């Protein structure tokens, strides 16, 4: 069925998601014992017990039916209530065994040219399932495959998704560590990286002030850092980064954020006219001139000011949406919905 996600839940049949449509792929409902035993097989004998204790599980699972085939999944297991009893839902997200090539992602030329900074931070943002990890994996593959790359690449992920075993790397080496299996947190991962002389650090998600702060420190000391963030837009990304810190630190941190930022990409996957999904991107490449412009911003105006800079120097989401609508790749309904969201966000900045 070309499924991207598979869901097992106590008291329900098996569901699969294919191009945004949820499909029932079995008639029989699963018992709690079946779901628990499946989780224990994937995670270990204490998997279901951990769920019952109120702690969810994020991990990966790999299945090899033979030497030539390999299937990988990102797995989340969470406790839930079904008919008044404790139950479990397991979500499997399929991961291609080989990272994609950047040439397969139809990235814009100005963006491609900016994705290998010598130092500073590249933020890839968007909702869950918007292709952030896929884009980062393509960037890493592209850099690692270069004959003269000479990069020690360290990744810290929760869980590890794409692997690079099948990629020819003439002059680079990749080490992937899983949080919390190998290190307790993303922030600990960044601190670990600084002791290993890397030429590229990937931080799976900047979800807290400690991780964001550690990534900034790594960038300030001359390292290129790539990370993801859950935000909706370039302007929203800067606002979220600044607001993640206590109010008394916000002004100083805003300066550090702007000094270290190199690229922000906001990506969405939307329905395409061929029944599949297509990536739309908003992005801004922060050169020295743009960083100087934003350093003059007042703290409370950073989001609105960034949006003005984006319109003049970057690619707003509305521009990419219009391009793909004119090319017949997305429907008028999808296009109008995206434009409406953009107008609402801009109105919010003006309030």
Please tell me what each predicted stretch does.
Residues 1-351:
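Short, flexible helix-loop junctions that flank or precede catalytic/ligand sites
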């Amino acid at each position: 069925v070309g499924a991207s996600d598979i869901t097992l839940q106590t008291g329900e049949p098996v569901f699969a998601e294919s191009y945004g449509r949820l499909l029932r792929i079995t008639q029989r409902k699963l018992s709690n014992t079946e779901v628990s035993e499946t989780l224990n097989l994937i995670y270990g004998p204490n998997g279901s017990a951990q769920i019952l204790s109120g702690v969810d599980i994020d991990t990966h699972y790999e299945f090899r039916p033979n030497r030539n085939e390999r299937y990988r999944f990102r797995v989340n297991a969470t406790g839930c209530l079904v008919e008044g009893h404790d139950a479990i839902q397991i979500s499997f997200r399929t991961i291609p065994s080989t990272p994609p090539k950047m040439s397969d992602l139809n990235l814009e030329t100005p963006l491609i040219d900016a994705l290998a900074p010598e130092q500073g931070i590249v933020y890839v943002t968007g909702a869950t399932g918007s292709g952030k990890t896929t884009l980062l994996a393509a960037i890493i593959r592209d850099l690692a495959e270069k004959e003269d790359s000479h990069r020690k690449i360290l990744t810290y992920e929760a869980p590890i998704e794409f692997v690079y075993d099948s990629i020819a790397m003439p002059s680079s080496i990749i080490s992937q560590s899983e949080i919390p299996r190998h290190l307790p947190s993303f922030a600990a991962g960044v601190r670990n990286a600084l002791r290993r002389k890397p030429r590229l650090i990937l931080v799976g998600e900047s979800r807290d002030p400690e991780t964001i702060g550690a990534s900034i420190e790594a960038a300030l000391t001359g390292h290129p850092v790539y990370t993801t963030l859950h935000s909706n837009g370039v302007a929203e990304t800067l606002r979220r980064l600044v607001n993640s810190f206590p109010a008394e630190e916000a002004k100083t941190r805003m300066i550090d954020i702007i000094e270290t930022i190199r690229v922000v990409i906001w990506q969405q996957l939307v329905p395409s006219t061929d029944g599949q999904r297509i990536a739309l991107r908003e992005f801004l490449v922060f050169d020295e001139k743009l960083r100087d412009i934003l350093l003059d911003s007042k703290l409370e105006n950073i989001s609105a000011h960034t949006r003005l800079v984006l319109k003049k120097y970057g690619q707003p989401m509305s521009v990419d949406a219009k391009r793909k609508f004119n090319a017949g790749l997305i429907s008028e309904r999808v296009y109008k919905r995206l434009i409406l969201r953009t107008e609402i966000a801009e109105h919010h900045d003006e309030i």
